[in-house]
Regions:
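Iron-sulfur cluster-binding electron-transfer modules in prokaryotic oxidoreductases
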Residues: 1-184
């Protein structure tokens, strides 16, 4: 992904074709392909479109909804609340994704509240680059910081994106779990 973002398209093409072949090999073997990070997983659907890749890499919630009947049901009366801050790429490129998380957490007896936040400001490598750091911090302060600092915030807060979790840890010293960590 970084090769593509930074314009190294020739190198990206080589890596993408090699990776696509490996993914297709796993898919042909019948292995469910699940990517943890939404940004990278969705790269296989967009930036890899020219590779001829046949295998489909699912977001965790897409796969979990296929086995929803095998998940344990939550205990009535013990319902708790968890907040989700979704990766901006996930919200825009896989709009059903957030609803799928809600379905999964509901099945587990957990009320999922999706916080209405924009980009955390990290945007992959963007926020790590010195020249972009001030803008990255400004973007974070626009929605993520206030959402995390809400005075009534007592619930667990999760974030789907690795870059988002990294940004929160960098800016506020808080380690947010991925939704899979909250489920386990």
């Amino acid at each position: 992904k970084a090769l593509h973002v930074h314009g190294y398209l020739g190198a990206f093409e080589k890596v993408a074709r090699r990776t696509a072949a490996a993914i297709d090999g796993l898919a042909e073997a019948g292995v469910p392909l699940v990517g943890i990070d939404p940004s990278m997983t969705l790269t296989f659907r967009s930036e890899y479109s020219g590779t001829g890749m046949k295998g489909r890499v699912l977001l965790p919630q897409e796969w979990l909804t296929t086995i929803l009947d095998r998940l344990p049901s939550g205990a009535v009366g013990q319902r708790r609340r968890i907040h989700l801050m979704a990766h901006c790429t996930e919200r825009t490129n896989a709009p059903a994704a957030v609803g799928q998380w809600k379905t999964i957490f509901d099945k587990l007896g957990i009320e999922l509240i999706v916080d209405d936040v924009g980009c955390c400001g990290m945007a992959g490598t963007f926020g790590h680059e010195v020249r972009n750091r001030a803008l990255s911090e400004t973007l974070y302060a626009m929605s993520w910081k206030p959402a995390l600092a809400a005075p009534d915030r007592v619930d667990v807060v999760m974030a789907t994106g690795y870059s988002c979790r990294s940004q929160v840890k960098l800016m506020d010293g808080v380690k947010l779990p991925h939704p899979l960590q909250a489920i386990l």
